[in-house]
Amino acid sequence: MKIKRAIGLELMPRLRPNLPGEEGRGKREAQMKSTTRAVVIGGGIAGCSTLYHLTQEGWADVVLVERDELTSGTTWHSAAQVTNFGMNQTMVGLKSHSIALYKSLAEDPDYPINYHHADGGIRLANTEAQMEGYRHFASMARGMGVNFEVIDAAECARRHPLISTDNLLGGLWDPLDGDIDPAQLCQALARRARKAGAEVYRHTQVTALTQHKDLSWTVHTTKGDIDCEVVINACGYRVNEVGAMMGVHHPVMSMEHQYFVTEPIRQIMDAGHRMPLLRCPISDYYCRQEKQGLLLGFYEQDCKTWGMDGIDPDFANALCPDDLDRVTDVLEGAFARMPVLMEAGIHTVVNGPITYTIDGTPLVGPVPGKRNAFCIIGLRAGLGEGGGHGWLLAQMIVHGEACYDTWCLDPRRFTGHGNVELTALKAIEDYQNEFRFHFPHEYRPAGRPIKTTPLTPVLASEGAEFAVVNGWERMAYIKPSADFRETHSFRFNETFDLVGDEVKAVTTSVGLSEISGFNRIEITGTGIHDWLEGLFCGRVRRQTSKVGLGYMLNHLGCVKADATIANIDDNRIWYGSAAAAEYHDMEWLKAHLPEDGSITLRSLTNAFTTLVLAGPMARAVLGEVTRLDCSKEGFGWLQVRQGFVGIAPAVIMSVSFSGEEAFEIHLPNNQLYAGYLALRRAGEAHGLRLFGSMAIESMRLEKGYLHWKADLLTEFNPEETGLGRFVDMTKDFIGKLALEKMISGGPRKKLVTLEIDCTHAPSHGGASVSRDGNVIGTVTSAGWGYRVGKNLAYAFVEPDMAEPGTRLEVDVLGLPEKAVVIAPGPYDPDNRILRQKT
C-alpha cells in the first residue's frame, strides 16, 4: 500500500502555532501585579480554562503566567477532538460542560471561534463484548442528560460512507462529537477572563515557588515576584519542572503522538456534508475531516515516551521529528477500514508530546502534601476535556468541593508509588490501549507488582489471582488451576462459581483473606476524642478497647470520609479507612489538628497488613493461636485487643465487612508470615480456605455496607445516603450548618437497595435506573448476593421512588431489566449473627 506525499510539510493555517493569538498581537500587557488571589502557571487549555472559570466562580483578582505564548505547548498541535464519551459520570459531566461552553464561545458575535460541534462520531467495535460495553456507557451517559446511540455495522456505514463494514459489528454514536480550533479556543477563554478582571502575562517564566508560614505563596518569575493565596500548576509537559519547585513529583509522562493531514479528497468534496469522526479500538487510530481532507491519528504499539530525561528549555511551538515507520501496522488497519486513504497524499505530518498519568485520567485537584496548591495536569485529551476540568477545579479552589464527586481526578489517589519509571510503563500501556476501555475486574499488567506484602508470593503460590487497589496487589479470588484465565466481560463470567464457593466457606466454616494496603493512622495525644467529635458527625466511641464506625462531612454537609476508630489505649487511637484514602484522609486530619501540638498523627499503612478471619468457626481458630480470651463474653463485637497470633504481635479487632463473625488481625509486615502460618495451621481442622476481595464485595452488598467513593460520595449528605443513624445533631461538627439547611429542604436523592430480575449479568456503577422510561437514578455498585440468591444493586434514586416495593427498571448491559426496591441489608438485617452473646 502506497501513499503519495505532498512536497513539503508546511503547516496548514488550522494547525499553526499561536504566535501570538489575536488577544496578544499588537497589545501591551498591563504591568505585572505584585499580589493576587491565585496564580495559574501555564497558558494552554488547562490554564486558560482554569483562569476563566475562577472568574466565573467570583475570583476576579487572578492572573495567568506563561513562559512563551498562549497555546505554545501541547495545545497548539492538538488534533482537538471534543466528545461526550467518558468512563464514569464525572467525566461525562465535565465533557458535557466543555461542549456547552465551547458552543457558547463559537456563537459569541464579538469573538466567534471555529467549532464543528455536530459532525457526530462513531467508536467502532468488532466484538459483542465491546458492544455490551458501549451499551453500558450509553446507559451511564443518559443519567447525565447525554444521549448516545449503539448502532450496527450497516448504520455505521450509512452515517460514514467512506468506511468498509468488514470485521465490524457496530459502534457507539455520539451526535455531538466534533473538533475545535485550539488556539482560538484558548484566546477566547483568556479574552473572557480578562473582561472579568483577570490578567495574563506572556513571556513570563516561573523560576521558583516559595510557601510561607501562613500557607500563602510567592511565585518568582523572570519579570518579578507575585504574592498569592493559591498556586495552580497547569504546565502540560513541563508539569514536573514546576512540581519540583514545590518539592513534589507528579506521576505524569509525555508520549510522542503522531497524526497526518491529507490533501483534499474528492469523495469528501462531493459528499455535501462533513464526515463523522471515527475512533477505532480494532486498529488503534482516529480519523476526522480536516477541511476537504482527513486527519488520521495513531496509537501505535511501538510508541515512545518523551522528555523523561529533561526537556529543552527552548522547546515551544515545536514538534518532534515525524516517524511514520512506527505506525505501519496502524496504517494498514486504517486503509482496510477506509480504502480512500490509500490514494490520498499527505499534506502535513505532526508529531508532538501529549501527557498521560498512571491510570490515564488527569490529575485535577489539590497537590498532595501541599496546602493552597492545585494542579490540572495529565490531560491527554485536553481540548475536549479542558473546559470541564477547569470548571471543576475552579469550584474546588473557591468552594472546597465541586458539584460532582471528583475522586477519579484527585491527585491524591496515587500514594507514593507514582515514580517516573512506573509512570512511563503505565503511560505506554494506556497509549497502546487508547480506545480500549477497561472491563470490570480488568487489571492490566504493566508496572506490576509495584506494592506488595510479604504474603504476596505466598498467596500467588496458593493460586491467588490479584486485583490492584491503590497500587497494592490484593487477592481477588483463588484460581482452580494454574492455567485458569477469566474472560473479561460486563456479564457474569467463569469466576462466578469460584466466588460463590468462597462465600459458602466463609458462611459455613471459616475463611482467611489478606487486605493489603488498608489505611491506618495512629493518633496519639491528649483530648483526642474531643478533637474527633468536631470532625465526625456522630458520637465518637471513647471507651478503651472499643471500636466505632463514623463519618466525616465536608463544609457543604456531604460525606467526606468514613473510618473505623479503634481505642487501643487511653491516649492512642487507630484510625482505619480505605486503601485509596491514605493521602486524602491524612491531609484532612492534618488540616484540622489543634494548633497547640497536643495531637500527633503517624501513618502505619506501610508498616502493617491486615488479615481477615471470618465465619462461624473464626473464633475457634483464633482461640487456638492466641492466649487472649476469645469467648463472646471476653471478646465481643466491635472490640479491640492487643496480643499475639502465634509468635507474631497483633492488634485484633472484632469487626466484620462480611456480616459473618469476623476478626481483623493487624500484623507488622516483618512478622506477617508468622501470623499467617499460625492461622493456616490452626484452621486446617476447621476447613479453613482462602477467600478474596470479590467474595468480600458480594457479602458487603448483602449486608448494606457502603464503599467509599462508590456509594459514599461528596455529592450527597448522610441522610440521603441512609446514614442518618450515624448523625448527632445535638453536637457541633464540620458541615453541621450546611447539613441542617439541606435536611430542611428535603432529600434530593436517596440511596436504596435494588433486587434485579435477571441472572446473566450484574448491573454496574453508573448504570441508569428508570421508571416508565424516564431516568430517575443511578447505580453506584452492584453484584450477586450468593447467600440471599439475589442480583443486587445500590442506587441513588428520586426520593418518591425509594420506598421498598417500588418497581423500577435497572439497566444491565445497557438494557432495562425489572427491579424492585428492597429493604437495605437483606442478609441478617438485624445483625443477629454479630450481636449474639453465646
What are these regions (language model features)?
Residues T55-T75:
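Glycine-rich FAD pyrophosphate-binding loop
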Residues L101-S104, A125-A196, Y201-R202, T207-L215, ...:
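Flavin (FAD/FMN) cofactor-binding and adjacent substrate-gating region
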Residues A79-R159, I282-C287, G293, P321, ...:
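Dinucleotide-binding Rossmann-like beta1-alpha1 core, especially the glycine-rich loop
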Residues S49, P112, A208-P321, D329-V340, ...:
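Flavin-dependent oxidoreductases
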Residues K33-A46, V63:
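Beta1/beta-strand and adjacent pyrophosphate-binding region of the FAD-binding site
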